[in-house]
Amino acid sequence: MVRKALENLKPYVPGKPVEEVERELGITNIDKLASNENLWGISPKVAAAIKEAVDKVNYYPDGGAFRLKEKIAAKYGVTPDNIILGNGSDELVMFLAMALIDPGDEAIMPVPSFPRYEPVVTMMNGIAREIPLKEHRLDLKTMAEAVNEKTRLVYLCNPNNPTGTYITKGELEEFLERVPEEVVVVLDEAYFEFARLFNDYPDGLNFFKKRPNTVVLRTFSKAYGLAGLRVGYGFAPENLAKAINSLRPPFNVNFLAQMAAVAALDDEEYVREVVKNTDEGKKFLYQEIIRMGLSYIPSAANFLMIKTEKPSALVFRELLKRGVIVRSGDIFGMDDWIRVTVGTPVQNARFINELKMVLEIL
């Protein structure tokens, strides 16, 4: 009954929701530091826009999201015809595979990385070529060597999730020189707003504007704080954007999401404050982790990987009992690591205190 390509696919398992932990463990006062969300919340301008829009949710949204596309186009100096929108950027990851992968075609991707690349390629009866990281970074040399006549698509997560490491401008330029122009290279920049603090971090939009078949994906879920509304966006060549617009569901970005995203783009000062606070939070966590005698991977995103020297599933469960939700590294093949979202000062301090207690008993 079910297509063969779907037989071994497993549903994506996100970070545990607060409500689920409350039900399972009967505890309250929970801090979710598992899903790389903006723990500072939404801007006042976004809150006001949502409040104003609520009275209009009885109408269908604009399927073409005209206002939002115009806003993004004006901000980034592209045409609306280059913009693709999704119910989160993960939907755009899927749309790209749907638009480009025929049975037997290949797509190249790093591993561990964002876990939706492989399933969507497999779903289309494509072949996912997963290239392991090298010292926690994308192995661009091996990825370039893996390109062949069957390669249609390359996914580059920059900064990479879960490691937080990033490709530099020079590294990306060298990689793109080695990849044939007919191969679509996707720069997944979900954490762009945080990574641009680094001088050698490449703005994918510059490469989109000068290299054919380059796609850039971004999201309102992270720095903008709209994870619950699900709105991702991207920049694609016009013919590819047209194909994606043809295959997407009619109203894939809902009305509240569109209005919130438009308002979010009007409050860049708030985003800068979130990025500044996150950077300060990371520095605090780095300092405390070193004091504990542990190691970490320096991150260009709003999360970091910490090497606990203990089985990650055990550390995860013990922190969970104490009301702190993190991500267990074993799901990424990093068994003695955990991934933690950078939170508010209170949340960061609580996490460090709870981690100290957990490691003392394990």
Swiss-Prot record:
Reaction(s) catalysed (UniProt annotation): L-histidinol phosphate + 2-oxoglutarate = 3-(imidazol-4-yl)-2-oxopropyl phosphate + L-glutamate
Needed co-factor(s): pyridoxal 5'-phosphate
UniProt-listed GO biological process terms: L-histidine biosynthetic process
InterPro entries cross-referenced by the UniProt entry: Aminotrans_II_pyridoxalP_BS (IPR001917), Aminotransferase_I/II_large (IPR004839), HisP_aminotrans (IPR005861), HistidinolP_aminotransfase (IPR050106), PyrdxlP-dep_Trfase (IPR015424), PyrdxlP-dep_Trfase_major (IPR015421), PyrdxlP-dep_Trfase_small (IPR015422)
Residues with N6-(pyridoxal phosphate)lysine modification: 222
Record-level Gene Ontology MF annotations: histidinol-phosphate transaminase activity; pyridoxal phosphate binding
UniProt entry keywords in alphabetical sequence: Amino-acid biosynthesis, Aminotransferase, Histidine biosynthesis, Pyridoxal phosphate, Transferase
Gene3D superfamilies per UniProt: Aspartate Aminotransferase, domain 1 (3.90.1150.10), Type I PLP-dependent aspartate aminotransferase-like (Major domain) (3.40.640.10)
Pfam family, one: Aminotran_1_2
CDD domains, alphabetized: AAT_like (cd00609)
Assembly description: Homodimer.
Family: Belongs to the class-II pyridoxal-phosphate-dependent aminotransferase family. Histidinol-phosphate aminotransferase subfamily.
HAMAP family: HisC_aminotrans_2
UniProt-recorded name of the protein: Histidinol-phosphate aminotransferase 2
Gene coding for it: hisC2
